[in-house]
Amino acid sequence: MKFNDELILLLKARYPIIYINTIEEDRVEYIIRKHIKANLNRSIYSWDFVDGYTNNPNNEGFAKRNPLQALELIERLTSETPALFLLKDFNRFLTDISISRKLKNVSRILKLQPKTIIIIGSDFQIPKELQDLITVLQFNLPVENEITQELTRLVNSLNLTIDPSLFESLTRACQGLSLERIRRVLSKIIATHKTIDENSISILLSEKKQIISQTEILEYWSVNEKMGNIGGVDNLKDWLKKRKTSFTIQASNYGLPTPRGLLLIGIQGTGKSLTAKAIATEWQLPLLKLDVGRLFGGIVGESESRLRQMIDVAETLSPCILWIDEMDKAFSNNDSRGDSGTSNRVLATFISWLSEKTKPVFVVATANNVDLLPLEIIRKGRFDEIFFLDLPELEERKEIFKIHIQEFRPNSWKLFDYKKLAQLSESFSGAEIRQSIIEAMYQAFDQQREFTTDDICLALKQLIPLAQLENSQTLKLQSWASSGRIRLASSKRISIN
């Protein structure tokens, strides 16, 4: 249901208090004044802490710096006066005992009258005692058709001519920005360059990165990793290849559902994070990384608010890749943060969104320890598929050595003995293989010569792989994966030593 329709429905049903969660205060007020007033013919009273009531000559400036007095005016107005009361940032006062008590008293009156309080704010926290009284509406960032309308208006007002393909690219680049931000950035572009062209897209993307960083929990990653940079995992590569065009119109017309995502479980250093980056590159989609530590940081109630903000931004930027690294630490069964209630609520919200989402946000989650993952996460249907990434076998290690040495020495990579290197690197992960090459390079650089196979062999003998240091955990994970509960990323058999 569209926001306008849902809000009108709540107003007709005489819901007493509605909270609109948004960062676009002006856009919400514009919609209310244009659409809601036309449909319901209600007087609109607008209040904020600094200016008090505005837009109504009889009460101009009333209740300045006094939120309790703002509620008293609502009580005093005659019952025959159909009205909407827009209380901006009023959510900041809800924890005050006098405000919460007054809201409870006022809500009983509002149920019998054509009056409604609409709280507009961006900090979504409602005290428990008011949750039954307040109905929450999420006002999302502008969608594609709204952005298209705004860009068309701007282009026409400036008498500009823009190629259709550039216009489409501009529309995509604006996704995830508020209308106010879009207007501001485009005004800056026109003031600087006197036109809108291909260079405008990079400026918009830079603005988008700044916006995403301001969420505090999402990071926009610029990536150039490719599937060819990952050795082995042929089953996983084949699965991803078949879904490369899953977000296209052709796939939708064919009847294919939008893919939900992928959970990668495995030993550290086996390429789980690298896979997330490679998917974004191969599918040519933006990559957003969730900062799990900040998700659960801050004061009580912020985690749920931040998760909803993350979902809103990701869906607005869709199609995109949402990368959740080390999910086992985020939603651990052995939660050490001391607030299992918060963790459970965040987990429930995330799982609900993952199961029901319709926007093309492809989630790539990684985990090292399956024992820490709640059963709700690994249950069938949450993700499209769950893959296990094991330590590379002999042939896969040869491939990994070739990939990394070719990166460092594109002209002389054929001079190395890959069979010997693969034989000496049993139990090494892909990340540890790369590290052995770097160690060999440091050794040779110190002696002012080129590094060789022997240098890498020496580095391998000096490095102790994590799989040996944590042998019992590695064997346990391999045993779990070999039991058939999970799909193997590689067609090579798991060998449990």
Swiss-Prot record:
Task: State the Gene Ontology terms under molecular function.
Answer: ATP binding; ATP hydrolysis activity
Q: Which residues bind ATP?
A: G266, I267, Q268, G269, T270, G271, K272, S273
Q: Which UniProt keywords apply?
A: ATP-binding, Chloroplast, Nucleotide-binding, Plastid
Alphabetized InterPro entries for the sequence:
AAA+_ATPase, AAA_domain_protein, ATPase_AAA_core, P-loop_NTPase
Classify the main location. plastid
Query: Where, per UniProt, does this protein localize?
Result: Plastid, Chloroplast
UniProt keyword Chloroplast, yes or no: yes
GO CC terms, sorted: chloroplast
* SUPFAM superfamilies named in the record: P-loop containing nucleoside triphosphate hydrolases
Tell me its family.
Belongs to the AAA ATPase family. Highly divergent.
What this protein is called in its record is: Uncharacterized AAA domain-containing protein ycf46
